[in-house]
Every structure is written in C-alpha cells, then in structure tokens.
C-alpha cells in the first residue's frame, strides 16, 4: 500500500525526477517565470521554496547546501545576491502558480510558475 508516501512520480526514475526538478528550479531562479504542466508546477514548489529560504541567509555553508541541490553556479549566485535579499522579510510563499489553459498536443493542464514580486519589464509598443 502507498499510504502516507508524499510526492508525485511522473512516470520517471528517482534520478530523472531529481534532475528534472533541479533543472526546473535553476531555470525558475534565472528567468523568474517558467511555463510547465500544473502537476510539475505544484511539485516544483516543494523544491524551490526551501531553496529560497536557504538563500535568505548568505554564508559558505548555505551556498554549499544550495549548490548541492541545484548544481548550477549562476542560479546559486542569483539566489543569494538577488532573491535572498528580496524575500528577507517574507515568511514563505515565494512562488505564484497561474493556470494557463491546456496544451494543444495532449490537453495537459499548463501553468506559469513565477516568483512573487518579480520586477515586470514593460514592453515598448512599436508605433
């Protein structure tokens, strides 16, 4: 029986799942907005939010913890230099998941995952 076993499997091996969420978290920290399926977005919260909490206190030990989970120097750097200070006073809830309809090929529910309070760049209108 599968009672009290949390987390989705996504029909992948544990190594594939771990690599997928590592890559998704790194992309989220770099771009601050990604589009993925709704179940993956919900599961990504469990990976990314604790990393941002680690990023709030800069130090060698915390940087090594973050690097062990992300394996991406650029993402870890941004996590501690930019994202950690941005969320220093926020007690959790760093991500927002917005539903984005259904994918054309397989009708999978899609969602945008974005960092709360990210700076929105205004696009210039060509006249």
Curated annotation (Swiss-Prot):
Any one GO CC term of the record: cytosolic large ribosomal subunit
Biological process annotations from GO: translation
SUPFAM superfamilies registered for this protein in UniProt: Prokaryotic ribosomal protein L17
Coiled-coil segments: none
Pfam families per the UniProt record, alphabetical: Ribosomal_L17
Keyword Ribonucleoprotein: yes
InterPro entries in UniProt: Ribosomal_bL17 (IPR000456), Ribosomal_bL17_CS (IPR047859), Ribosomal_bL17_sf (IPR036373)
Superkingdom of this protein's organism: Bacteria
GO MF assignments: structural constituent of ribosome
Similarity section: Belongs to the bacterial ribosomal protein bL17 family.
Matching HAMAP family: Ribosomal_bL17
Subunit structure as annotated in this protein's UniProt entry: Part of the 50S ribosomal subunit. Contacts protein L32.
Protein name: Large ribosomal subunit protein bL17
